[in-house]
From Swiss-Prot:
It is an enzyme of class 1 (oxidoreductase). It is found in: Nucleus; Cytoplasm; Cytoplasm, Myofibril, Sarcomere. It comes from the Eukaryota. Binds 1 FAD per subunit. It is linked to Myopathy, myofibrillar, 8: A form of myofibrillar myopathy, a group of chronic neuromuscular disorders characterized at ultrastructural level by disintegration of the sarcomeric Z disk and myofibrils, and replacement of the normal myofibrillar markings by small dense granules, or larger hyaline masses, or amorphous material. MFM8 is an autosomal recessive form, clinically characterized by slowly progressive symmetrical weakness affecting both proximal and distal muscles, with normal to moderately elevated creatine kinase. A mutation in PYROXD1 is the cause of autosomal recessive limb-girdle muscular dystrophy. The affected individual with a homozygous recessive PYROXD1 mutation showed progressive muscle weakness with an onset at the age of 9 years. Initial symptoms included excessive falling while running, with slowly progressive weakness. Difficulty navigating stairs by the age if 18, and loss of ambulation at the age of 37 years. Neurological examination showed proximal symmetrical muscle weakness and wasting, along with calf muscle pseudohypertrophy. Changing Q372H: In MFM8; decreased function in cellular response to oxidative stress; no effect on subcellular location at nucleus and sarcomere. It comes from Homo sapiens. GO terms for molecular function: NAD(P)H oxidase H2O2-forming activity. This is Pyridine nucleotide-disulfide oxidoreductase domain-containing protein 1. Residues 213-228 have a biased composition (Basic and acidic residues). Its main location: nucleus.
């Protein structure tokens, strides 16, 4: 059998993964080495391309994520050769990867950008949906059109967006924290956003622009071949645009929040009936909860002893790095979160193998105002920087750490508000000797600044505050701001004039 295998193809540079990190890395390498073939190995027939990139400030950036067929990438970069197949095995000692189609690809430098997989609260249950990529988002839309009630488990960015976007369907949202959006916000910011959630949504929404899906041309057989339910790359910003997230009922928002609880058990209808369990109706306006007489396809028992029936469950409980295909026979150093450990040049513990994006775990001495979060902005930055490091190593040059790792900076949208997160925006790891300064105009803006020893360490800006560039500079230059006191957030003082 071995003799029938096609001869290995060789590429000086091989990149695995068609998400933002992998495509950015491949594009950067293709630009740097126009006469070299860059191999991009991806299990999916579509790739994620960064378009309309805008540098808002030194570090803050905005871009669109466009989902395209891999042929479009080849048109832009003729020296990128896309291999549409999953990875079966990595033979690091032989500098070779074996793809699912049985082919071998020899590399001189390899970058692993295979992303992460959703942590499902329950594997193999047809009523539990994990939303991670476009295919699962479209499956969710299909299920929602028939749904009267759904349950969302989790408190990350996708859960936040879903809860705001879903209409015409009862939503029970279970989170293990005291407040929503714990990864991104403290209780104050959560309260600010929750008031927006409870208010009825107007039909006219601000037009989003970041994600466009151009996937109509993709082949059906290619989709099934890619096993997209397992390996899809992460959704970009505004992933729900173009999806009509409406249930069967004629109302806008009906959300019930269950805090400080997790899923204890999931029952299918037959099991629920046999066990003679009792479930609650959807809680309404502080009325006492009553037993639900309606039968549902699936039931969720929470750790607070409440049981609710629903049409299906959305598992939005985070991700785990997708390292599985690469571990067998290779002694990678792994981080506590299961990611491939990378040094300050995005190099893993194995020779000539780099990693970027959700699959990796940073293990260098981090800047005091930067932290790794598995977000699309960091995927782009890491993919870009990994390519620079691979290029420098192959030509024997040295390279400085990229400036984007000096300060954590992320801009996004939640509940139709612009949200900017800077530095240690939630006082992550700062100990108890920090203080917070707040300014809040209900329905318009929420500003929180994290101070330590008179210096700004982080900030959360919700709404159109126009303070991001000033605050970015203040965090970066670590100027002592003690003398300004509360004036820093005084709306009557133009703070930018102070620090021009």
């Amino acid at each position: 059998m071995e003799a029938a295998r096609p001869p290995p193809t060789a590429g000086k540079f091989v990149v695995v993964g068609g998400g933002i990190a992998g495509v950015t890395c491949a594009e950067q390498l293709a630009t740097h080495f126009p006469s070299e073939d860059i191999l991009l190995v991806t299990a999916s027939p579509v790739i994620k391309a960064v378009t309309n990139f805008k540098q808002i400030s030194k570090i803050l950036e905005e871009f669109d994520v466009e989902e395209q067929s891999s042929t479009m990438l080849g048109k832009r970069f003729p020296n990128i050769k896309v291999i549409e197949s999953g990875v079966k095995q990595l033979k690091s000692e032989e500098h070779c990867i074996v793809t699912e189609d049985g082919n071998q690809h020899v590399y001189k430098k390899l970058c692993l950008c295979a992303g992460a997989k959703p942590k499902l609260i329950c594997e193999g249950n047809p009523y539990v949906l994990g939303i991670r990529d476009t295919d699962s988002a479209q499956e969710f839309q299909k299920q929602l059109t028939k749904a009267k009630r759904i349950m969302i488990i989790g408190n990350g960015g996708i859960a936040l967006e879903l809860v705001y976007e879903i209409e015409g369907c009862e939503v029970i949202w279970a989170i293990k924290d005291k407040a929503i959006g714990n990864t991104f916000f403290d209780a104050g910011a959560a309260e600010f956003l929750t008031s927006k959630l409870i208010a009825e949504k107007s039909e006219a929404k601000i037009a989003h622009k970041r994600t466009r899906y151009t996937t109509e041309g993709r082949k059906k057989e290619a989709r099934s071949k890619s096993k997209a339910d397992n390996v899809g790359s992460a959704l970009g910003p505004d992933w729900h645009e173009g999806l009509n997230l409406k249930g069967t009922k004629e109302f806008s928002h009906k959300i019930h929040l269950e805090t400080m609880c997790e899923v204890k058990k999931i029952y299918l209808q037959d099991e629920f009936r046999i066990l003679k369990k009792k479930s609650f109706t959807f809680p309404r306006d502080h009325k006492s909860v009553t037993a639900d007489t309606e039968m549902w396809p699936v039931y969720v028992e929470l750790t607070n002893e409440k049981i609710y029936g629903c049409d299906f469950i959305v598992s939005a409980t985070g991700v785990t790095p997708n390292v599985e295909p690469f571990l067998h026979g290779n002694s990678f150093d792994l981080g506590e979160d299961g990611g491939l450990k990378v040094d300050d040049h995005m190099h893993t513990s194995l020779p000539d193998i780099y990693a970027a994006g959700d699959i990796c775990t940073t293990s260098w001495q981090l800047s005091p105002v930067w932290q790794q979060m598995r977000l699309w902005t960091q995927a782009r930055q890491m993919g870009w920087y990994a390519a620079k490091c691979m290029a420098a190593a192959s030509s024997g040059d040295s390279i400085d750490m990229d400036f984007s790792f000096e300060l954590f900076a992320h801009v996004t949208k939640f509940f139709n508000y612009k949200v900017v997160l800077l530095g240690k925006y939630n006082a992550q790891g700062l100990g108890s000797d920090h203080e917070l300064m707040l300014r809040c105009t209900k329905g318009r803006e929420y500003i929180k600044v994290v101070m330590q020893n008179g210096r700004m360490m982080g900030a959360v800006l919700i709404g159109e505050t126009d303070l991001e560039e000033t605050f970015e500079n203040l965090i970066l230059n670590q100027m002592n701001l003690s003398s300004y006191g509360e004036d820093l957030l005084d709306p009557n003082i133009d703070i930018e004039d102070y620090f021009d």
